[in-house]
Amino acid sequence: MPTISRQEYVGLFGPTTGDKIRLGDTNLFIEIEKDLRGYGDESVYGGGKSLRDGMGADNRMTSENILDLVITSVTILDARQGVIKADVGIKGGRIVGIGKSGNPNMMNGVTPGMVVGVSTDAISGEHLILTAAGIDTHIHFISPQQVEHALSNGVTTFFGGGVGPTDGTNGTTVTAGPWHIHRMLRAFESLPVNVGILGKGHAAVAMPLVEQIKAGVAGLKVHEDWGATNSALRNALRVADEMDIQVAVHTDSLNEGGYVEDTIDAFEGRTIHTFHTEGAGGGHAPDIIKVASQMNVLPSSTNPTLPYGINSQAELFDMIMVCHNLNPKVPADVAFSESRVRPETIAAENVLHDMGVLSMFSSDSQAMGRVGENWLRVMQTAHAMKAARGKLPEDAAHNDNFRVLRYVAKITINPAIAQGISHVLGSVEVGKMADLVLWEPRFFGVKPKLVIKGGMINWAVMGDPNASLPTPQPTFYRPMFGALGKTLQETCVTFVSQAAMELGVKESLGLERQVMAVHNCRAISKKDMVRNAETPTIEVDAETFAVRVNGEYATVKPVRTVALNQRYFFS
């Protein structure tokens, strides 16, 4: 059999097993662990290439038995799959195959269900990286334009609350009451992302919560600005257990209703998603970070403090004053803001992410966080932690696969598991909805090349539409056909409770998007957090705020420069 050099092969078909890829300008290198295609029978689109009539494309089969879309020879980076090279087959908006595509009449080893034919389109993935699209579980629905910025950084799913720029929405991720819930469910009909709405979890009895769950929320939020009391937490968790939804909490910074130990007691061992697990964004001062040691706690933190930089402390004060309706002329308000910003716990937050103790990243959009920077901050933090802490014990000698996959999990599969949507989204696996992001390695984590939503490209870097090619300047992100008309509704999902599904919320509100129920939100724990399931003992010194993890001081110095930064942006 004829052979070619590895360098020639990479030029033609992209990297294969054993090849390494640098991610942007970071210090992170991934190595392809296995290749599921067949050497010499690769599916390649283009003039003179193999995916032609009667060659790699079957010219007899009808659409029923062939792919709608094939992504050829792409490097898959997925928290569950690892780092693999494969073709990815999409049909009906879902992933139906990962392996070898083509024409089984002419090619050996074609994976069942991955036949290419007359009804198949192709994306050339030879020199690209494919990930599951990002999931942001901490969105303040302040402005609909957040969607554009999120898509431009590879995020296709929003979980959060709010109704626009009210003071309540600016401070809390809560859509309060059936009237607001129904208006927001209808508003999202025209926005090209998946969505799940969080209702207000503050009640002394069940019915005010139950009516929101039946109205169509996918979870509840308990927030200190509305009173994160132990009674509210217990009641919300009790109702959530009965109706299989998730509860998110932003705890009591002022410790008015109790301390962190009291809040842990109020959880009563039940599953809960803790926002701001470090505390700069809010929560028991100074030691909310201790909840990350609990098996029933699914901990996330937000991107303003990740990675920990020399300006992190300074910018957080003003963020808090604006978001939480505080007055800089009132000493008590100033003290409240200052109590939340602790460099020692911010440094520890970064370390705990690197150790796999904090399981998820989110943005806290326009309410102390940046919705268009989740993938960016994930990769910047991974780079900064490798620079500060060296290789992880789990990493191989010559690649950073484990560390990179740990961080990818924080923005893909783990948020999906926490919010009860991992049966639909969160990973590059057969059967999942085809919400996928294609990246050029040099732009990984910064600027995706294509965002695929439900099997259709809905967001992409595109040049001048009046040019003779797609590439001439100015190139910037533009909505594609998948984000328009009825196709938007066919490729996007609104997540609601099972109770709302059974009551026919889709029909009663006239929703045209796909509507699906969240499930398995309660019978999960920290051990289900992929590559981020550690539960060490965490202690915080009440005087110095120093954090110790299993007795060892957990800290890093603030970074002065970060990867994936000004080299990639004009400002």
Swiss-Prot record:
Active site (record annotation): H324
Reaction catalysed by this enzyme: urea + 2 H2O + H(+) = hydrogencarbonate + 2 NH4(+)
Alphabetized InterPro entries for the sequence: Amidohydro-rel, Metal-dep_hydrolase_composite, Metal_Hydrolase, Urease_alpha_N_dom, Urease_alpha_subunit, Urease_AS, Urease_asu, Urease_asu_c
SUPFAM superfamilies, sorted: Composite domain of metallo-dependent hydrolases (SSF51338), Metallo-dependent hydrolases (SSF51556)
Chief place where the protein resides: cytoplasm
Any one Gene Ontology BP term: urea catabolic process
Record's cofactor remark: Binds 2 nickel ions per subunit.
GO MF annotations in UniProt: nickel cation binding; urease activity
Gene Ontology CC annotation, any one: cytoplasm
Mod. after translation: Carboxylation allows a single lysine to coordinate two nickel ions.
UniProt-listed PANTHER family: UREASE (PTHR43440:SF1)
Subunit structure: Heterotrimer of UreA (gamma), UreB (beta) and UreC (alpha) subunits. Three heterotrimers associate to form the active enzyme.
Record protein name field: Urease subunit alpha
